[in-house]
C-alpha cells in the first residue's frame, strides 16, 4: 500500500519479510486470536489506521474493526475458525479459511473465504482483503466440535478435513 501508514510503535512478531515458518506462525496466531471472539484483542494485530475490505464492507482503523467484529460475533454464535496458509512473499500473506457458526434461530453455516494480508515492518497487519461465502449446513454436516476458543493442536486443519 502506498503512502504513509500508521505511526503505531507496537511490534508483533514475526515481522516481515516472512519465511515459510514465520508465515505459518502468523496464520496460526491470527486463527487463535479470532477464535477468542474478543474484538479488542483481535484489533491489536492491526495498525491503528488498518484498512479492511470484508465482503462488501470497507473499514479504516482499529475502532471500526472493533465495532465490526462486535457486530459479527453478536450474529455469528458458536463461532469456530480454521485458517490455512495459501501463499506468502515479502510483506504479504494469503490464506484460505472456513468457519462454522449458527444464527439465533439455530441454523448452522460454514463460511468459506480467502484473505490477502499486507503487513507493516512492525508485523502489524495494515491491510486485510477478505472474500467470504456462507453455505447453510445441517447439524450433521458440522466438522468443528472443539470447545469454544483455540483449536487444539491435534485437531485436523482444512486440508485434512477435505475443506
Regions found by a protein language model. Give the residues of each.
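Short, aromatic-enriched amphipathic alpha-helices that serve as compact interaction elements
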Residues: 19-35
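Short, well-ordered alpha-helical segments enriched in acidic and aromatic residues
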Residues: 36-49, 53, 117
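Short solvent-exposed beta->alpha transition segments
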Residues: 51-70
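A beta-strand edge to alpha-helix "cap/lid" segment located at domain peripheries
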Residues: 2-18, 67-163
Amino acid at each position: 500500500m502506498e503512502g504513509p501508514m500508521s505511526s503505531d510503535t507496537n511490534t508483533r512478531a514475526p515481522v516481515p519479510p516472512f519465511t515459510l515458518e514465520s508465515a505459518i506462525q502468523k496464520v496460526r496466531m491470527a486463527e487463535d486470536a479470532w477464535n477468542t471472539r474478543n474484538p479488542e484483542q483481535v484489533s491489536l494485530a492491526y495498525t491503528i489506521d488498518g484498512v479492511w475490505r470484508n465482503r462488501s464492507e470497507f473499514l479504516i482503523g482499529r475502532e471500526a474493526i472493533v465495532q465490526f467484529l462486535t457486530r459479527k460475533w453478536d450474529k455469528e454464535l458458536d463461532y469456530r475458525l480454521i485458517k490455512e496458509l495459501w501463499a506468502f512473499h515479502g510483506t504479504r500473506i494469503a490464506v484460505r479459511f472456513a468457519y462454522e457458526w449458527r444464527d439465533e434461530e439455530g441454523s448452522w453455516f460454514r463460511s468459506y473465504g480467502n484473505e490477502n494480508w499486507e503487513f507493516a515492518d512492525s508485523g502489524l497487519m495494515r491491510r486485510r482483503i477478505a472474500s467470504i461465502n456462507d453455505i447453510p449446513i445441517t447439524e450433521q454436516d458440522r466438522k468443528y466440535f472443539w470447545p469454544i476458543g483455540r483449536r487444539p493442536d491435534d485437531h485436523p486443519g482444512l486440508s485434512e478435513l477435505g475443506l
